[in-house]
């Protein structure tokens, strides 16, 4: 049997598909890649905030809905909190490091004033502004290779990226991992997800064999938070859960650049209930500060 996997045509997307594909091969399943151009690819120089929501996923998911592919593979942080009702999460791979990193000559504490850091994420911009208000940020688009090339050419004095991207691309840049209390990651950062058609029971059963349950539980808890308070690349909210045994450890943060709210939780339970509880804690603190999510 050969499974058709839809994904963006970028180098990173191809690597992510192959990571999932290797898991399939181990259980005797072949795969082929269906390259899809997304709005984010076609307008690669425009700010993400201008392109709207779902810019990395819409066309890829449509290929599955239209029967052109069996599975859509994404970085899970790029998919909306409300998945198309005809689609379902079939599997996630074991999570790569979820952290944000700083690529710069010095660590965050020692950065010079008035330098320019490249990031297109409002979350990263606001967290950085709260900690180091004297540092400038500037939008940067393009794949990871392009961003690093701009940094090396001195167009930027630093970059903030997801550590998982560098790991998957096998890049050996020196970097500084950012503390999760200062830079709480975007929900589902570091997770590769496979979406399929709900009605496709045969393929759903195949993907159960490669699903990493603890990672899925972390992902669902984080998605419960953002479904209450918002999240994603257009949001200044970060959330991260770590599951150890039956215990969930979670943190969620918001910043507008001038003030910052952080809440945490530690308890056993099911992902949705614990994630919702953390989301309500953050929502309550935001309301106390007259912030409307």
From Swiss-Prot:
Pathway assignment: Porphyrin-containing compound metabolism; protoporphyrin-IX biosynthesis; coproporphyrinogen-III from 5-aminolevulinate: step 2/4
Gene Ontology molecular functions: hydroxymethylbilane synthase activity
One annotated Gene Ontology cellular component of this protein: cytoplasm
Recorded superkingdom: Archaea
Residues recorded with modification S-(dipyrrolylmethanemethyl)cysteine: 233
The entry's keywords: Porphyrin biosynthesis, Transferase
A biological process from GO: protoporphyrinogen IX biosynthetic process
Cofactor(s) needed for function: dipyrromethane
Entry keyword annotation includes Transferase: yes
CDD domains: PBP2_HemC_archaea (cd13644)
Protein name stated in the entry: Probable porphobilinogen deaminase
Family: Belongs to the HMBS family.
Pfam families assigned: Porphobil_deam, Porphobil_deamC
Reaction catalyzed: 4 porphobilinogen + H2O = hydroxymethylbilane + 4 NH4(+)
Enzyme Commission code: 2.5.1.61
Free-text remark on how the cofactor is bound: Binds 1 dipyrromethane group covalently.
Taxonomic source organism: Saccharolobus islandicus (strain Y.G.57.14 / Yellowstone #1) (Sulfolobus islandicus)
Extra facts: The porphobilinogen subunits are added to the dipyrromethane group.
Function field: Tetrapolymerization of the monopyrrole PBG into the hydroxymethylbilane pre-uroporphyrinogen in several discrete steps.
């Amino acid at each position: 049997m050969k499974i058709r996997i839809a994904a963006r045509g970028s180098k990173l997307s191809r690597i992510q598909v192959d990571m999932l594909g290797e898991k399939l091969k181990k259980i005797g399943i072949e795969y082929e890649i269906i390259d899809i151009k997304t709005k984010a690819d076609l307008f690669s120089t425009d700010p993400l905030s201008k392109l709207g929501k779902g810019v990395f996923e819409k066309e890829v998911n449509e290929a599955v809905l239209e029967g052109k592919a069996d599975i859509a593979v994404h970085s899970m942080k790029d998919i909306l909190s409300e998945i198309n009702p005809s689609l379902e999460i079939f599997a996630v791979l074991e999570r790569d490091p979820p952290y944000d990193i700083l690529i710069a000559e010095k660590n965050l504490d020692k950065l010079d004033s008035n330098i320019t850091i490249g990031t297109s994420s409002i979350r990263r911009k606001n967290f950085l502004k709260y900690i180091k208000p004297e540092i400038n940020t500037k939008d940067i688009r393009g794949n990871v290779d392009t961003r690093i090339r701009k940094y090396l050419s001195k167009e930027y004095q630093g970059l903030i990226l997801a550590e998982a991207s560098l790991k998957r691309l096998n890049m050996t840049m020196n970097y500084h991992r950012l503390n999760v209390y200062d830079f709480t990651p975007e929900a589902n950062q570091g997770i590769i997800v496979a979406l399929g058609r709900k009605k496709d029971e045969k393929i759903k059963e195949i993907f159960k064999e490669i699903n990493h349950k603890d990672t899925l539980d972390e992902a669902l808890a984080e998605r419960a938070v953002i479904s209450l308070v918002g999240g994603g690349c257009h949001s200044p909210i970060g959330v991260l859960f770590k599951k150890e045994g039956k215990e969930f450890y979670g943190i969620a943060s918001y910043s507008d650049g001038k003030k910052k709210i952080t809440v945490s939780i530690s308890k056993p339970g099911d992902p949705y209930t614990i994630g919702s509880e953390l989301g309500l804690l953050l929502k309550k603190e935001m309301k106390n500060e007259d912030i409307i999510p």
